[in-house]
């Protein structure tokens, strides 16, 4: 398994994204990590698909989307359909919020996008 260096968009200057991306091109950053937070699963609210459209148009760096939302089974298919032929290379969802991980994983991977699971540090997992 290969590791990637991903720069989190949440730390970027949103008023100057193009310059931020130009600076990233001079580094070893291989992915841009894009957090989508809904204010329910986590208390913060971040950007959505309109901002992601702008991001895709400003950089060719591959994009990793991390969904911190309470309903990924509903939201992720919309994003997959919209972004399957773009620079989005990976989608990560939280184990605790998925109703059908297998179905969601198959949908994402069938589109050619990688799929990952995140786990809340306090969650108990039985294997």
List each model region and its residues.
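Anion (oxyanion) recognition and catalysis
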Residues: 109
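Catalytic pocket-lining loop regions of alpha/beta-barrel enzymes
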Residues: 106
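Conserved small/polar residues in nucleotide/adenosyl-binding loops
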Residues: 125-127
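Active-site glycine- and acidic-residue-rich loops that bind
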Residues: 10-15, 113-123
């Amino acid at each position: 398994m290969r590791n990637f260096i991903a720069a989190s968009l949440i730390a970027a200057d949103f008023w100057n994204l193009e310059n931020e991306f130009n600076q990233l091109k001079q580094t070893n950053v291989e992915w841009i990590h894009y957090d989508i937070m809904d204010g329910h699963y986590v208390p913060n609210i971040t950007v959505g698909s309109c901002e992601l459209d702008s991001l895709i148009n400003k950089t060719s760096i591959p994009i990793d989307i991390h969904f911190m939302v309470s309903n990924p089974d509903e939201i992720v298919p919309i994003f997959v359909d919209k972004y399957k032929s773009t620079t989005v290379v990976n989608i990560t969802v939280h184990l605790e919020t998925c109703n059908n991980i297998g179905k969601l994983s198959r949908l994402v991977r069938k589109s050619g996008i990688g799929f990952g699971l995140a786990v809340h540090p306090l969650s108990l997992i039985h294997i």
